[in-house]
Amino acid sequence: MPKNTKPLVFMITGVARAGKDTFAACLMEHFNGNGCRAEVFKFADVLKDRANDVLRAMGVFKAGERDFHAEEFKVRHRGLLVELGRTLRGVDKDIFARHLNAQIHMFLDYAPLDVRPVALVSDWRYLNEYLFLAKHLDAQIVTVEMQRPGYGPANDEEAGSLADMMASMQILHTRLAVDPAGVRAVASEI
């Protein structure tokens, strides 16, 4: 039987601090060098980049500190990112999916021919994002929900979007309820 060489896309969801990025990093480590080339993609990176542009324009940006990619700063000022994201989705509900789709297409188009490209989307939050990528990518999509005991939604926006996805459980393939130490073991089994 021939080996599956169709591009692979992991869409990882879960509440803030559930271990999505840790799981993606473990998958990247697992796939790279094993006949695959993996790269992490995030819907929210473009949002954080534009928020950082505002900080730069105001003369207060400081990499790693006053920076929306820095965890502590992001958590403290999450409200701005939530409102900006909500506003942009009001303009076009697929705005972030459309942007990420273009990034993944570029990754797939330029992947070496002798490797299987693996896109790891570590911040999937909305059902329409899955539906958009499933429609526009010729890839095998694997969805994963990360659950971490003791952690719940960071805000109402996160709670609502996760509830919408859970109502459409037929699209979820895998639900992982593991502590961060167990993530590496699970990733190595994929």
Name each region found by the language model.
Residues 1-10:
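Extreme N-terminal, non-catalytic leader segments
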Residues 20:
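Conserved lysine of the Walker
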Residues 100-159:
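ATP-dependent NMP and nucleoside kinases share a basic, alpha-helical "lid"
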